[in-house]
A protein has these predicted regions:
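Nucleotide-sugar donor-binding catalytic core of glycosyltransferases
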Residues: 2-75, 79, 89-96, 113-248, ...
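N-terminal Rossmann-like NAD(P) cofactor-binding module of classical short-chain dehydrogenase/reductase
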Residues: 86
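Short beta-strand/loop segments at the ligand-binding rim of alpha/beta enzyme cores
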Residues: 102-112
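Short alpha-helix at the nucleotide-sugar/activated-sugar donor binding site of glycosyltransferases
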Residues: 254-255
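A charged, aromatic-enriched C-terminal amphipathic alpha-helix characteristic of glycosyltransferases
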Residues: 285-320
Length: 320
């Protein structure tokens, strides 16, 4: 049986979804190692805290890092050989790690869920890889990456009660001003619209926490759980990042859940699943949404089109 090593951060639980997909669809033995953690290691007891203080002071070692990243370092050091090594966010690995990993496979691959413009440090790792994948069309053209769109992951779940007309899930970032404007407009015309934003450092207090339409939390919503929340809304809202030339995960989440979507990302027009019945492209500075878009039912898509954007298809593109 072929062997695949998958290395990725645990950000938003994306890694677990890909890991499960690799195990299910690759027909290979898959090893997964986390390269970076959303939450720092927490001491199990006061003895560990004292031990770490001693190690840092007298041995130049960090117990927290060794406990959290020990598995990654062990995989890098050992002599195992893999048919493929697939890495997300290679910029969180050291140059020495990348060189050692390259010696453990004939096919070292990377996939990028953020554009190079958004995370410039990713550029330094490109040369180590035999093949790179990205959802960003400009990066594919500029760096010779292979295009692999994001995907939908829709676990089987019971029908959820509809709570919202329009819902946005995301992080508290530079999009928030236009988010506030859109939410105020939608609620003003009578559509119950809300946003839940993640901010790792937030205690819920910010100028935007005063908005009745926005909830800010420092509790991370894993990727696999966000579907349950999104399924409680009739329509999903997607807002483009300034430094991306492709679609984020939200449009594909809408595909998997068969939900309508409002977006300000003009790239949506280039995809074969676009239809004005299901997707409304807006200008946040001049919002125009027809009443028909809200009142008419979702128009189901052809299964062949849906299949192109499934996790299974995404996995097959990566490992082929």
């Amino acid at each position: 049986m072929k062997k695949i090593l998958f290395i990725a951060p645990d950000y938003y639980g994306f890694n677990e979804v890909v890991y499960d997909g690799l195990k299910k669809y690759s027909n290979a033995k898959v090893t997964h190692v986390v390269s970076a953690y959303t939450q720092r290691y927490k001491y199990k007891h006061i003895g560990e805290r004292i031990q770490n203080l001693f190690m840092k002071t007298f041995l130049g070692r960090n117990l927290k890092d060794e406990r959290q990243y020990g598995e990654l370092k062990e995989v890098v050091r050992n002599s195992d050989f893999f048919d493929q090594i697939i890495i997300n966010r290679p910029d969180v690995l050291s140059t020495d790690d990348l060189i050692r990993l390259k010696s453990k496979t004939n096919m070292l691959k990377a996939f990028f869920w953020d554009s190079i413009e958004k995370i410039p440090s990713q550029r330094d790792s490109i040369a180590y890889f035999d093949k790179c994948f990205s959802f960003d069309s400009l990066d594919c053209e500029k760096y010779g990456f292979e295009k692999n769109t994001n995907f939908f992951f829709a676990p089987t779940m019971p029908n959820q009660d509809i709570i919202y007309d329009v819902l946005f899930l995301g992080t508290q970032d530079g999009r928030i001003d236009k988010l506030v404007k859109i939410l105020e407009h939608l609620n003003r015309i009578g559509y119950h619209s809300r946003a839940f934003l993640y901010n790792h450092y937030s205690n819920g207090e910010s100028e935007y926490s005063k908005s009745p339409f926005i909830t800010i939390t420092n509790k991370l919503i894993p990727f696999s759980q966000s579907y349950k929340i999104s399924s409680q809304s009739r329509i999903l809202l997607d807002l483009a990042q300034d430094n991306q030339a492709g679609l984020s995960f939200r449009p594909f989440e809408a595909l998997g859940l068969q939900k309508k979507m409002i977006t300000d990302n003009p790239n949506i027009l280039n995809y074969d699943f676009y239809s004005p019945e299901n997707i409304c492209l807006i200008d946040p500075e001049n919002i125009k949404i027809s009443e028909d878009f809200f009142s008419k039912p979702y128009k189901p898509l052809d299964t062949a089109i849906l299949g192109k954007y499934s996790l299974e298809h995404w996995i097959h593109n990566i490992i082929k």
